Amino acid sequence: MKKKTAALFLTGILFLAGCSSTAGNTTASSDKTEATSASSGNTDQGKVLVAYFSASGNTEKIAKMIADDTNADTFVITPAQPYTDDDLNYSDENSRVVQEYENPDKQTIELKTTDVPDWDSYNTVYLGYPIWWQDASWVVKSFVQKEDFTGKTVIPFATSMSSGLGDSGKNLEKLAGTGTWKEGERFSSSASEDDVKKFVSGNN
């Protein structure tokens, strides 16, 4: 048991990925399922959507910066059963997220909705998620498996404390099976607006 607990603690450090130390942000966006429209969604990338899942608020912060910079609409990917602080306690081997990590059959997450308004009208989708155990959160994987990205350019972005983007974008591309996927970017919790602007300009 001690070895198992130690292993969970070590992998849990990587899980901190998109998890902020500010607990109050954990479910701040959990009830938002509709796409929020910008005044225009048009840039050099065509009509843009920023779709994201944020466990603690870090991914949401980056998503909003991207949306502001691209004049994009936003869509919050929301689990039907939102994650609580206790659910996200990586150091507790009985917590929801650890149980899901250790049991891949539990990683197909029911979402509140996958019906993105005017989905077919978007040319570019920025797809945001926290890194959990060196890969994309399985919440966003469940979203990707439900959507058809045909004809769209998909640009992943992730948040983590220390882990890089790794193969998370490539793994999502394989799950999707459609769309033109770009390399993507990983941001820390301290990422600035300038960091985000460089990321966006590099994808125009």
Give, region by region, the residue ranges found by the protein language model.
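Long, proline-/serine-/threonine-rich intrinsically disordered regulatory regions
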Residues: 11-12
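C-terminal motif of bacterial Sec signal peptides marking the signal peptidase cleavage site
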Residues: 15-18
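Active-site-proximal alpha-helix that buttresses catalytic centers in soluble enzyme cores
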Residues: 2-8, 20-204
